[in-house]
UniProtKB/Swiss-Prot annotation:
Superkingdom in the source lineage: Bacteria
Gene Ontology biological-process entries: protein folding; protein-containing complex assembly; urea metabolic process
Cellular compartments annotated: Cytoplasm
Signal peptide: none
Cross-referenced SUPFAM superfamilies: Urease metallochaperone UreE, C-terminal domain, Urease metallochaperone UreE, N-terminal domain
Similarity field: Belongs to the UreE family.
Record-level GO cellular component terms: cytoplasm
Organism per entry: Citrobacter koseri (strain ATCC BAA-895 / CDC 4225-83 / SGSC4696)
Gene3D superfamilies membership: Urease metallochaperone UreE, N-terminal domain, UreE, C-terminal domain
Record keywords: Chaperone, Cytoplasm, Nickel, Nickel insertion
Protein name according to UniProt: Urease accessory protein UreE
Length: 152
C-alpha cells in the first residue's frame, strides 16, 4: 500500500486520482482506494482540508494523486436576491450547517427539514448530486495556505 503524506503546490505529473466526499477530505488519516483500484493510506497533517484539484504525494514524490470532490446528495438554493441569500446563510449558520457559498447559490448536505425552512422564506430549494466544497470554517483550516481568523 502506498501512503500519501503531503499536499504539493508545485506542478507534477499526476499518476492517479482519488475521489472523496467531504467527510473523508477532512480526515488526516484514512484508508482509501485510488481511481485505478490501488489501496492507499492518507497520513496527512492534522487540520488539512482537501479540495477538489489538490494534489497529494508519497514522501518520495514518486506518486502524485489528484483529489476529486465526489458528487454528494446536496440541497441547492439559487437566488438572485442577495438579501434572501444572506438570510438563508444566517439561519443555516445559526444551526452550524456546513455551507458552500457560490455567487447566487448555496449548497449544504441534503436535509428536508432545512429545505422546508428555506422554502418558508420563498427560496427555491432543489436536490442534486454535486461536488460539495463547504467553507473551510465548517471543518478545518483551508488547504491553500491562507487563514481566516475567527473569534468570539
Amino acid at each position: 500500500m502506498l501512503y500519501l503524506t503531503q499536499r504539493i503546490e508545485t506542478p507534477a505529473a499526476v499518476t492517479a486520482t482519488l475521489t472523496l466526499p467531504i467527510d473523508v477530505r477532512v480526515k488526516s488519516r484514512a484508508k482509501v482506494v485510488l481511481g485505478d483500484g490501488r489501496e492507499a493510506g492518507l497520513l496527512l497533517p492534522r487540520g488539512l482540508l482537501l479540495r477538489g484539484g489538490d494534489r497529494l504525494s508519497t514522501e518520495d514524490g514518486a506518486e502524485v494523486v489528484e483529489i476529486i470532490a465526489a458528487n454528494e446528495a446536496v440541497s441547492v438554493v439559487r437566488c438572485a436576491d442577495p438579501f434572501l441569500l444572506a438570510k438563508a446563510c444566517y439561519h443555516l449558520g445559526n444551526r452550524h450547517v456546513p455551507l458552500q457559498i457560490l455567487p447566487d447559490e448555496l449548497r449544504y448536505h441534503h436535509d428536508h427539514v432545512l429545505d422546508d425552512m428555506l422554502r418558508q422564506f420563498s427560496l427555491e430549494v432543489t436536490f442534486a448530486h454535486l461536488p460539495f466544497e463547504p467553507e473551510a470554517g465548517a471543518y478545518a483550516s483551508e488547504s491553500h495556505g491562507h487563514h481566516h481568523g475567527h473569534a468570539h
